[in-house]
């Protein structure tokens, strides 16, 4: 498959297979990677089924994770998602290459499938890792959240002189309670596994700075790219589906030969 490129001075989209697209990215040129690959659980993406033999899927993961290692800077960070079924395989692959900093639980409001003979799943794992043990970007002051003390009264720290109220903000724990994207939300795009803007915003604010380059090798709805646009980062995105690339071109205002009516936002339940 021939790779197609759509770009301006800040954003670049490559339409093609992920491993082919990696050849377009220079070694140690990326500050942050967010990757949300197909989970190998049988979902359909633009007419293609996401289902491979387990061994084949693991070998494929090893290939693109190796490419992430090649392109990310020594000070860079990587966030990888996967299903609860395949996360252990991915975790072991990454431990041989990166320094794992956190294993994050993204907890959302409800399971998409109402299970009858097991407990329904309402979370997805995120692996946060870095190429170096120290010296990586982590802007804790940019992602503070309200500390939930359970108290109705203002808590005072009497160890301080003079005594003062406890700081009401803290760095988030590794359990992120962020709602999933729903059909009626303004941010909804026609993609079956779209990730919330709030989740991507937290990742980008924590592990990159303005002007840094962020890579998403499985761009899908291009929500990572859109968050980079809002937060003044550069963005590189790969996507195999032309249907989803059109979403990216629209969301990032990139020049293309597609007519305006082809790029118009459509809302269809997936």
Question: Model-predicted segments: where are they?
Answer:
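Post-kinase regulatory C-tail/linker adjacent to protein kinase catalytic domains
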Residues: 264-270
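Short, conserved SAM-binding/catalytic segment
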Residues: 2-8, 249-263
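Core catalytic lobe of class I
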Residues: 2-246
């Amino acid at each position: 498959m021939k790779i197609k490129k759509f770009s301006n001075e800040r954003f670049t989209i490559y339409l093609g297979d992920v491993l082919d697209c990696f050849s377009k990215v220079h070694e140690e040129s990326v500050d942050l990677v967010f990757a949300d690959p197909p989970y190998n659980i049988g979902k359909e993406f633009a007419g293609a089924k996401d289902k491979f033999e387990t061994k084949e899927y693991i070998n494929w993961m090893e290939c693109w994770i190796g490419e992430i290692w090649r392109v990310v800077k020594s000070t860079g960070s990587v966030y990888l998602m996967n299903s609860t079924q395949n996360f252990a395989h991915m975790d072991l692959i990454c431990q041989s290459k990166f320094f794992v900093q956190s294993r994050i639980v993204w907890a959302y409001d409800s399971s998409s499938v109402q299970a009858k003979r097991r407990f329904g799943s309402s979370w997805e794992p995120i692996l946060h890792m870095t190429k170096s043990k120290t010296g990586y970007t982590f802007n804790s002051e940019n992602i503070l959240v309200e500390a939930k003390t359970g108290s109705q009264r203002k808590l005072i720290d009497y160890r301080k002189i003079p005594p003062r109220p406890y700081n009401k903000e803290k760095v988030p724990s590794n359990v992120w309670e962020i709602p999933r994207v729903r059909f009626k939300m303004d941010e909804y795009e026609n993609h079956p596994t779209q990730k919330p803007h709030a989740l991507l915003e937290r990742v980008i604010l924590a592990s990159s700075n303005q002007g840094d380059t962020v890579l998403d090798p499985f761009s899908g709805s291009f929500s990572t790219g859109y968050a980079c646009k809002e937060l003044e980062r550069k963005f590189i995105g790969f996507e195999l589906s032309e249907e989803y690339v059109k979403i990216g071109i629209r969301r990032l205002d990139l020049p293309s030969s597609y007519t305006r009516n082809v790029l118009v936002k459509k809302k269809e339940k997936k």
